[in-house]
Every structure is written in C-alpha cells, then in structure tokens.
C-alpha cells in the first residue's frame, strides 16, 4: 500500500502547484485567509502543523453548513474559487463536497501545507452490486513525513478530524470512529455504526485534476436521479452532535446514536430552524419557495444520506 503511495508522491507535488496557481489567480492571500478564519472562528497560528489542521478541521463543518440548495433548485454549481469564496464566506451560505473541499484545499495550501486533491466513489448506503461514479472530493495532507486525509464535507457523516493514513486501525474523532482499509490499490473509508462498519467511499492515491472535479460536479448537480436534485439536504456538526435537515424533517443525533426528530409544517418555523440550528439564513421569499418544494416532495431521503 505504501509503495503505491510513494509512486504518486512526486506527481502530486507538481500537480499541487498547478492547481493552486489556477485557483488563487485573482484572490489576495492575506484577505482570503483573514476572511476564512473569521468565517469559522479560528484565531490560532498560521502554520502548517498537525495541531492547526486539526483545529481547522473541527471548526469548518461547525461554521459552514453542508447544503445542496443550488442543484436542488436547478441552479449551476460553479467551482472557481472566487465564486466559492463569495458563496461560502461572504454570503455565509453552505455547499457540498466540491465547494467545501476546494475552499479547504486553497486555505491549506496558502498556509503552507503540502496538499493533494483526490477523488472518490461514494459507497455510503449503496448496495455492493451498484456501480458509482467519481463524485466526491477529499484531500491528502503531508505533515512531517506522515500522511493524513482531510474531508470537511460528506453530509451527515462528515469527518471532524483528519485521519492518518494507517490501515485497519480505528481512529476516534469528535463525531465518531473511522478506519481506512485497502483492497488491492483501492482504499476504503469506513464509519462505525451501531450495525458495524459501513463503507463511506473508496478512492486511490493518484492526484485528481480540476477537470475531474468539474465532471463529477456536473454529473452530481445535473443527473436527474441524483439525490441532490430530488431532496434538500442540509447538515452541520456541533460539539457532540450532528444536525440534519432532509426536506422538511430535522434530525439531531448524538455520538451514542440517539436521535430526536421533528417534521415542520410551515415555512417560518422551518426557516428559523435552518438559521438557529444549521447556521443557514434564508430570505423570507427563498424560504417560502424552498419549503413549498420540500413539503411536496415525494422522494424522502434517508436521514443518513451524505455526498
């Protein structure tokens, strides 16, 4: 497994430089980092250390919600960094994996971290016989000769800590236990549930290119059967709990797996929950429009859906 890792390491170095140059062309580094730190409430040192990565990784999904409002409404999801910064930071909205992890990648690289973007096949709650495409973005981060996987956006199963690249070893995070397994050249991220280990996604170590994410994003946001076009999914982590809105139903789950649920019957109360519990503020008109859509939806997604 580590032989494969070394094979792609040199390629990743050159790739990262190209990716960063494309993404940061028109954005001031200092202003970018300052605005991001203010958005997530980070006040620590600006250095490429494990401790800093861990702090950012827990703060990001607490402050910036995972949400798919744009594709659910039929809008495009641009992946250029300027658009993502405007949406997730300045307009204080959320997004899904390609948006969150593109932002996180740019932040880490500007802080001096050695980061490689990767792409994965989602397997969460997908039958083993069903094939899936490359529709999820994650990051590999090198710190002092050790490799870590960072991922701040997988819906209700989002990591709140980087995971070290060690195989078959349970790793405890603030929101659950994960492990990384390997079959041939394929790595699998698994999450421990009450019914056992469940595979979240599968991936390799070859660095992904921007075009890979553009293709995955286009498919995810336009394919008629995509969950992101058929159900509204909004989630956020808070200390000790995960919070999720699927259409009109809010679920709060603690680390023991205990949950409480409430289905909303009117737009004002629903919008207030989004604002106070999930950190997402909508205008009255937008809330009414979205609530009408979700309350009429016939395709209720599982409370555990991620993406």
Residue ranges of predicted features:
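Hydrophobic alpha-helical packing residues
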Residues: 104-108
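Mixed-charge, low-complexity segments
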Residues: 24-94, 109-133, 154-307
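Short beta-strand scaffold segments in enzyme catalytic cores
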Residues: 137-140
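Beta-strand scaffold of nucleotide-dependent catalytic cores
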Residues: 150-152
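Aromatic (phenylalanine/tyrosine) cluster motif
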Residues: 2-5, 14, 19
């Amino acid at each position: 497994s580590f032989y494969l890792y070394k094979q792609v390491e040199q390629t990743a170095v050159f790739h990262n430089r190209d990716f960063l140059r494309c993404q940061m062309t028109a954005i001031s580094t200092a202003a970018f980092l300052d605005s991001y730190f203010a958005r997530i409430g980070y006040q620590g040192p600006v250095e490429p250390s494990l401790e800093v990565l861990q702090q950012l990784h827990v703060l990001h999904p607490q402050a910036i919600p995972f949400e798919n409002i744009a594709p659910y409404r039929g809008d495009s999801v641009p992946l250029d960094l300027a658009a993502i910064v405007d949406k997730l930071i300045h307009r204080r909205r959320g997004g899904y994996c390609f948006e969150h992890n593109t932002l996180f990648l740019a932040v880490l690289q500007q802080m001096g971290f050695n980061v490689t973007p990767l792409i994965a096949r989602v397997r969460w709650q997908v039958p083993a016989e069903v094939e899936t495409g490359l529709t999820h973005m994650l990051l590999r981060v090198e710190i002092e000769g050790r490799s870590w996987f960072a991922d701040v956006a997988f819906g209700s199963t989002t990591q709140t800590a980087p995971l070290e690249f060690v195989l078959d070893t349970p790793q405890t995070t603030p929101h659950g236990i994960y492990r990384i397994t390997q079959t041939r050249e394929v790595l699998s991220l698994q999450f421990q549930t009450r019914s056992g280990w469940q595979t979240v996604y599968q991936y390799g170590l070859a660095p992904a290119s921007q075009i890979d994410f553009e293709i995955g994003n286009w498919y995810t946001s336009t394919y008629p059967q995509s969950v992101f076009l058929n159900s509204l999914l909004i989630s956020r982590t808070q200390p000790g709990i995960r919070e999720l809105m699927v259409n009109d139903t809010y679920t709060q789950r603690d680390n023991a797996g205990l949950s409480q649920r409430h289905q909303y019957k009117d737009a004002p109360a629903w919008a207030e929950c989004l604002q106070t519990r999930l950190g997402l503020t909508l205008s009255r008109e937008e809330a009414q429009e979205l609530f009408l859509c979700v309350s009429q939806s016939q395709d209720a997604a599982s409370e555990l859906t991620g993406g």
